[in-house]
Amino acid sequence: MTTFCISCDISYLDDMLQHMSKLGLSNFLILDRVLGKYPQGEPRLDSSIWPGYNAMIIIQVTEDEAEQLKTLILRINQESLTNLEYVYW
């Protein structure tokens, strides 16, 4: 088993969950209002200076599911218009 901590802008959470559902991944935890800064993009600190926040999905998967999830996240990031839309794990 592998544990993923997937983080994305809150506005992309529903899309991410739909993609995961198509892979048959339905057991997970969601942490709402996750604040922070990633290597790409601007900080999301839910403040007047750095608006916005992330959501985090925590999921345990098999090795096969882990490969599918990595492929999914890489594809989402390649199709992103800006680094503000990136999904991190």
Language-model segments: what does each one mean?
Residues 1-89:
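Positively charged, small/polar-rich N-terminal and surface patches that mediate targeting and assembly
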